[in-house]
Regions:
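Long, highly charged, low-complexity intrinsically disordered interaction regions
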Residues: 116-177
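DNA-contacting surface of Y-family translesion DNA polymerases
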Residues: 178, 186-286
């Protein structure tokens, strides 16, 4: 079984933990709204006003004038992330970090020591809460794809288990947009086909999916059937240092893109300094989901 652990509003939650007077208030971590900054993280209070990550800070302030803006302390968040990762490694060496605030864990070999996967997931969630005073949402499922969806369903402070014999019952009522690789354009095609749920997608003939999406159609069919054979890949000796983010909405203005490029560059630079390294080559990778 696979666990996906995802820290809830990580940057903002760390700030609220360290400054109890911020509890219950709308918190935004990111750039100065007077200097073309961008929202790096928003707590759940401010999200109720429509604020989300990757949004220009000036726009966020218009949506929630009472929001409290805090500068990002990326080095410190990395230290807290290391503490979280140490908790993961108590239960399994098979930990695949995705970013500072989320990771996949393969706990298939941990049952004799720590009990069933659901128990391991709850122990991890409890340890993070008790030792670090932070909240994680946890999904437990037969594979990475399902575990990721499970951890997202009941945020914040969620815990969802998907049993192997209940995969289709879990997936079928969900909207097709829950599938990896279904972006705005793909969603429009499904709407024209009358497909709204994963169940409806699963019932489409594979030939129809391939005719509209090519080889991507077969990938979507497998996900709709709950199939994901990717293993959890633990940390290896790094040959490169990178940082990436996924935007909740498309970015199409140069100022926001420039601000985020600077943000990601600063995060990579901090990690280089932590490990006393320097880079020789710089690469920029852009991915679009259609």
């Amino acid at each position: 079984m696979i666990i996906h652990a995802d820290m809830d509003a990580f940057y903002a939650s760390v700030e609220q933990r360290d400054r109890p007077e911020l509890q219950g208030k709308p918190i935004i971590v990111g750039g100065n709204p007077d200097q073309r900054g961008v929202v790096a993280a928003a707590n759940y209070v401010v999200r109720q006003f429509g604020v989300h990550s990757a949004m220009p800070s000036a726009t966020a302030r218009k949506l929630c004038p009472q929001a409290i803006f805090l500068p990002a302390r990326l080095d410190y968040y990395a230290q807290v992330s290391d503490q979280i990762r140490e908790i993961f490694h108590r239960f399994t060496p098979l930990v695949e970090p995705l970013s500072l605030d989320e990771a996949f864990l393969d706990v298939s070999g941990s049952e004799r020591l720590f009990g069933p996967a659901e128990s391991v997931g709850r122990q991890i969630k409890d340890a993070i809460g008790q030792e670090l005073n932070l909240i994680a949402s946890v999904g437990v499922a037969p594979n990475k794809f399902l575990a990721k969806i499970a951890s997202d369903l009941e945020k914040p402070d969620g815990f969802v288990r998907v049993d192997p014999d209940a995969v289709q019952a879990f997936l079928d009522p969900l909207p097709v947009e829950r599938l990896w690789g279904v972006g705005r354009q793909t969603s429009k095609v499904f709407q024209k086909l009358g497909v709204r749920t994963i169940c409806q997608l699963r019932e489409l003939p594979l030939s129809v999916l391939k005719s509209h999406f090519g080889s991507h159609g077969e990938h979507l069919s497998k996900l709709a059937h709950g199939i994901d054979n990717r293993p959890v890949v633990p940390d290896r000796e790094a040959k490169s240092i990178s940082h990436e983010t996924t935007f909740a909405t498309d970015l199409d203005d140069q100022e926001s893109l420039r601000a985020w490029l600077l943000e990601l560059t600063e995060q990579v630079a901090r990690r280089l300094r932590r490990h006393a390294l320097r880079g020789r080559t710089v690469e920029i990778d852009r991915k679009s989901v259609v």
